[in-house]
Amino acid sequence: MADGEICRCQVTDPPLIRHEDYDCTARMVQKRIEIGPLGVLLNLNMLFHMSRVRHIDVYPYLNNIMSISVSLDVPVSSGVGVGRVRVLIFTTSRERVGIFHGWQVVPGCFLNAPCYSGVDVLSDELCEANITNTSVSSVAMFNGSYRPEDVWILLLTSSTCYGYHDVVVDIEQCTLPSNIDGCVCCSGVCYFNDNHCFCGRRDSNPFNPPCFQFIKDCNELYGTNETKQFICDLVGDDNLDSVNTLTKEGWRRFCDVLWNTTYGDVESRTFARFLWFVFYHD
């Protein structure tokens, strides 16, 4: 992405970011996602904030999405030689996300099942991989633009695909609105090193990790003892309040651990468990 410079933020004006030749594409990479027999469900906004590539981007947030390309490295069993991957891209509001939890656990939602009644399907593609070519890709060009928090990717693999999958997501964003001085109106989380720049979203304090609001809004993280134990393992008991829920500092530590854990086995397990708790617990 192009170099960016934060404009001076005025008290009464929206925060602005100066830009030149802004690159409207962004790339997200998540290594070693284990896609089990029930698949894995990814939210585009969360994936962006969890991805290692986003750390070097000029803009630490996503604008509305116009297209998306999903690429996977799919290990295929040598005994069979061919594996199939279903890449389903759909959109829905956060209020309706609860309807998807049953997809992961109800028998019959397999590779060839429709499984998307009542949602806006943007792309649904069945791809094949083999031993010599383990890369598959799916591209969706949207008629309109969608908020990243409303875009979801469901990955389903056949039993002949095993182990961990590397996922790469390339997106094209809408051009950000700018004023006459060439400054872009801030539409998301601001630069973290500017404590004067706040972007109008709830809890958009630049000193909070951007995943904070997403996790806080997700009621699935409050409902089970397994989830509480998982969080305790990450943040420590001293970051829980008297009713055994996370304090604000606990949430920040939780996000920091998920975001900054050393890449490798520990990070892949942490990310996989995080997804599992978010999407598999009703």
Swiss-Prot record:
InterPro entries: BNYVV_p31 (IPR007004). Involved in efficient vector transmission. Might slightly enhance symptom expression and increase root-specific silencing suppression (Potential). This is 31 kDa protein. It comes from Beet necrotic yellow vein virus (isolate Japan/S). The gene is p31.
